[in-house]
Amino acid sequence: GATALLLRTADTGALAAQLEGVVLPAIGIGFEGDAATPDHYHTLMALASERGDDAGLLDIDLGLGPLHALAAGLALHAEAPAAHRLFRVDGWSRHNRGLTAAQELGLITAGLAAMLRGAASAGLNAGDIASRVSVRLALPADSFAGVAACRAMRRLWDGLLSACGIAPTPLVLGGYASLRMMSLLDAEVNMLRTTTALLGGAIGGADLMTGFGHDLLTGEREAGQRTARLVQVMMMAESGLSASLDPASGSPFIEQRTEDLATAGWAAFQAIEAAGGLADAIDSGMIEDQAEAASARREQRLRAGDSDLLGVTLQPVAGPVPDASAEFAGISRPAAIVEHLRRTALASPPRLLILRGASDSAAGEERAMRRLLAMAGLQPVILGADEAEAITAARPDVVIGCGMTAVPHGLAAGSFRAAASILDSGDRLGCL
């Protein structure tokens, strides 16, 4: 990364090779997945000792979860320097599976509560453990949503500490660019999405941010990784946004949006607590059900035309659709339904004919139908209703009438659909 490394390798023996040539005190070092273990932490400490580095000066985020790895993290607490973060509560991964922003904040808050509760039950000072955690929050393409999410997360943390009688403690907040927002179609647009996502994190006050190459879904190339790193540094440093503690403070729009999101996030947290806490909410399927329901609502908005995606439903580019790597199969991407539609259409493209009538509505309906068909990568032939010979020669599978409700008398054409009925269907993808 630009200023930090995130390690995922399960083999502790590979750690020395991975960090060869790396000045440990100069960067942040994080662990996740199979690498987030006490063994990896001890291996890193031994490596730092061999190099003569002061362990207390290292910026370490071990990334232990607040549920199943809680005991392991609490056991490390006594020996680890105070600056080392042992726990991480990850809302980003659940965001990618479909959770709304409020549900994600509620889940993170529930994870933080579980950590503090577990520390108190183990006889430790929960206030000391409060400084041992970081959170991972999703940054969507909507910059304002990212700003509000970061600011609301800090409000929820402050509220949780206050409710627990713990003195205010800074929360290390990591903003991660959403993977849910990405598309295989016109993948270069993902660079724009990542830029606006990280802008939201920078204005919202994220302590660290991570972006991804625009081609991540099909395998990041070096150029994509470099661009993502440059965007991160631009937003965190060169933009100057980090010079202010809270660049968005005082904006009525941002303040209200933050307040509304914090209120909704606290309600989501209370719902999880009422279900028995985060562990029970996950085991019962409550969190997964929330993600599926939110994804379904998101899909419905896309179908109805209430939301759009650049390069997917707006300004789509014709061409084949690549396949995403298997590791991203669990991500609930709104663009996926359009990608599937494009693959289906390209596998067996129908012969489409747009028949233009003489009514005043014909031109507008034609433009709307061309935009709609472009979502599926379909290119229709366009003829006037009076071009009988050309219509017969086209041998269309489907005739779409613009400014007309039926095929002109005497013309033999394929299945006829009136453009008006298609455009008014309420499901622009289903009609395709």
Model-derived regions: residue spans:
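Mobile "lid/hinge" segments at catalytic clefts and subdomain interfaces of large enzymes
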Residues: A83-L116, L192-F269
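Catalytic alpha/beta active-site cores
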Residues: A2-D142, G146, C164, L171-G174, ...
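Conserved, mostly hydrophobic/aromatic
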Residues: G1, G52, W157, G204, ...
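Flexible, glycine/charged-enriched surface loops at secondary-structure junctions
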Residues: S121-R132, L161-V172, E238-S249, I272-G285, ...
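Catalytic alpha/beta core domains of metabolic enzymes, predominantly
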Residues: S134, A138, A145, A149, ...
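Short glycine/threonine-rich loop-to-helix capping motif typified by GTGT followed
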Residues: T100-L105, P140-A152, S178-L192, G219-A228, ...
